[in-house]
Amino acid sequence: MKPKIALVGVGRFGKNHLRVLKELEKDGLCTLHGVVDKSNEILENVKKNYDVATTSNLDEFLKSDIDAVDVVTPANTHFELCKKCLTNGKHVFVEKPIATNYAEARKLVQFATEKDRILMVGLIYRYNPAVKKIKELIDLKKLGKIYYTFGHYMGFKEPRTDVGALLNFTVHHIDIYDYLLEEMPKEAICSVGYFLGRENFEDLAVLVLRYRSGSVGIVEGGWLPPGNYRDLTIVGSKKSVTSDLSKQTVILHDIYFERNDDTFKAIDKGSSTLAVKFEGPLKLELKDFVECIKTGRKPVANGEVAARTVMIAEKALESARLKRSVKIHESK
C-alpha cells in the first residue's frame, strides 16, 4: 500500500514538505496526489517544477480516494482544516502548533479518535537524531538524575502573523522536555516582551517549567536577537550534555560534584563528542507518518502530545499576564 497524500499549503515551510513528499514518492513510499494553495501564483510555480495536480479547493481532493492530508498553513487555520479532513475520514499531519488554543486542540484529538484516523503533528525535534541520542542517554541512566534543562530557539527573521514566540519557538523545547523527561511540569513561570508593538503576539518569551520530579526546564525564544540559536543543555547528577540541534552534535561532559560534609568538589574528567548520524528530521518525520498510516501505529508526535504543548504554552501566557507562577494541573 502506498498512501495517497494531498499537501495543503506551499508557503515558507510548505515548500520543504513538498520537496520531502516528492522524495518519499520517489522512494516508493507514498504518492503525492496533489497540492492545495489559495495562491494561483504558487500553484503555477508548483506545476512548472513538479508533476502533480494542483487546486485552490481542498474539497476536490477530499472527495477523491486520498488517504491523508498534510496541512502546512497558518496556525489560525489549523482547526477548521484538520476538522474538515478528519470528518471526511482522512488521516492528518499538521504542522505545529496543532491549534492556537487547548480547547480546539482537544477537539481535534476527539475527532481523530471518533473517526479512527491518524493525527500527527510537526513536533519535529522528536525526530532529530541529536535529541534521540540524548533520549537514549537519559533512558540508560547515563546522566543520573536530571537537575535541569535549558535551551534557546530564536533568531532574527520576519515574525509570524498568526502566533507569537511561545507557539512558534518555545513550544519546541516544551515538547523536547516532555519527550526527554516523560513528565508534565507542575508549574510555569514566564515573562514575555511585546517590543515590536504587536498587542496579540509576543516577540520574546522566557519560560521556566518546574517538574514534579524536581527537574527544571528553561527555554528562551523569539525573533529579536541576531544569529540563529537552536541549542539544548541537559545537566545531570552524573554527567551533562550539550547539543547544537541544527548541526545535530551531542557532546557528553563527564562533570559532577563530590560532596564532603558541607563542601563540594567540582570534578571535570573532560568531554567527548558522540557519534550521531546526520539526517533530515522532516523526512524522518513524514516517513513515519506514512508508516503510521500503513500500520495503524500511533505516532510519537500524536495529537495528545501536541495538545499538551499548547496547554503548557497557554499556562505560560497566563503566567506572563498575571506576573506570577501558574500551576499546571493537567495530568499526563
Question: Where do the PLM segments sit?
Answer:
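N-terminal Rossmann-like dinucleotide-binding module
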Residues: 1-49
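C-terminal helix-rich "cap/oligomerization" subdomain common to oxidoreductases
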Residues: 2, 60, 68-71, 290-332
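Active-site loop of classical SDR/Rossmann-like NAD(P)-dependent oxidoreductases
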Residues: 16, 38-41, 273-287
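Beta-loop-alpha module in the N-terminal Rossmann-like domain of NAD(P)-dependent dehydrogenases
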Residues: 17, 50-111
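A contiguous active-site-proximal alpha/beta segment in oxidoreductase catalytic domains
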Residues: 99-158
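Mid-domain beta-loop-alpha active-site segment that forms a flexible
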Residues: 122-129, 153-187, 202, 211, ...
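Contiguous beta-strand/loop segments that form the cofactor/metal-binding neighborhood of enzyme cores
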Residues: 172-251, 279, 283-297
